[in-house]
C-alpha cells in the first residue's frame, strides 16, 4: 500500500484539475476561508497540507500584508506550489513535513487546513488540534475545510460512494462535524462553529480568545 506522500506525489500532475471535479463547490470553500481571514487580516498564516499551493495563493492575493507558510508531505505537490507562487517568494515559505506530527515553530495568527485532516485517524486529529492550539496566537483562529462523515445513516446512504478505492479505504478517515467541534473545544479553543457546509464537505472555525 502506498503511503499518503507517495499517493500525492503521483497525483500532483493532475491534482488541480481533478480536485475541482471531486469536491463540490471548491471555490466557494475558499471564498468562505478568505472571508473569515479578512475580518481581522492575519500577519502570519500556516497552511497544513498545502498541496499545490492554491489556498496559499488565494491568501496572498487577497491579503497583501500577510506572510504564509505551507507544510505538505509531498515533495511533488510542493514543487508545483513553488511554481504557482513564483513572484511571492518574499511572503511565502514552503516546508516538507507530515501533519501527523507537524514541525511547527513560533505562533501564527491563523492556521488553516484544507482537505487534509480527513487523512488522520480520530486520535491523530485530537493530537493535532492540541498542537495547533499551542501555536495559534491569542485572538487567532484555526480553520478546517474538509470532508466530514455524516452522522445520519440515511445521509451516509445518500452521499457516500458505495465502494471506496484502495487509497480511500486505507487513508481517508472522516469524522463528523460534531466530533471535530468537541475535539477542538477539548484542545482549548474558546469558540467553535460550522460556518459553511454542503453535502459531505464543510468549513469549521475555532477561535482562541485573547489572554
Label each PLM-derived region with a short phrase:
Residues 143-187, 192-194:
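C-terminal alpha-helical "lid/dimerization" subdomain adjacent to the S-adenosyl-L-methionine
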Residues 34, 57-60, 133:
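A structural alpha-helix within SAM-dependent methyltransferase catalytic domains
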Residues 46-48, 52-101:
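Class I SAM-dependent methyltransferase SAM/SAH-binding core
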Residues 113-117, 145:
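Residues lining the SAM
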Amino acid at each position: 500500500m502506498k503511503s499518503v506522500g507517495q499517493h500525492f506525489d503521483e497525483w500532483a500532475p493532475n491534482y488541480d484539475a481533478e480536485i475541482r471535479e471531486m469536491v463540490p463547490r471548491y471555490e466557494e470553500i475558499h471564498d468562505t476561508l478568505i472571508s473569515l481571514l479578512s475580518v481581522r487580516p492575519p500577519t502570519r498564516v500556516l497552511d497544513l497540507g498545502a498541496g499545490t499551493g492554491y489556498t496559499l495563493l488565494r491568501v496572498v492575493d487577497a491579503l497583501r500584508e500577510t506572510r504564509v507558510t505551507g507544510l505538505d508531505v509531498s515533495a511533488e505537490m510542493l514543487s508545483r506550489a513553488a511554481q504557482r507562487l513564483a513572484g511571492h517568494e518574499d511572503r511565502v515559505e514552503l516546508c516538507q513535513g507530515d501533519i501527523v506530527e507537524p514541525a511547527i515553530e513560533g505562533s501564527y495568527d491563523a492556521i488553516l487546513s484544507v482537505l487534509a485532516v480527513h487523512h488522520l485517524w480520530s486520535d491523530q486529529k485530537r493530537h493535532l488540534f492540541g498542537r495547533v492550539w499551542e501555536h495559534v496566537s491569542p485572538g487567532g483562529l484555526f480553520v478546517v475545510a474538509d470532508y466530514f462523515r455524516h452522522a445520519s445513516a440515511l445521509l451516509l446512504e445518500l452521499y457516500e460512494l458505495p465502494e471506496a478505492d484502495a487509497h480511500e479505504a486505507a487513508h481517508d478517515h472522516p469524522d463528523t462535524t460534531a466530533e471535530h467541534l468537541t475535539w477542538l473545544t477539548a484542545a482549548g479553543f474558546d469558540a467553535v462553529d460550522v460556518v459553511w457546509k454542503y453535502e459531505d464537505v464543510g468549513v469549521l472555525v475555532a477561535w482562541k480568545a485573547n489572554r
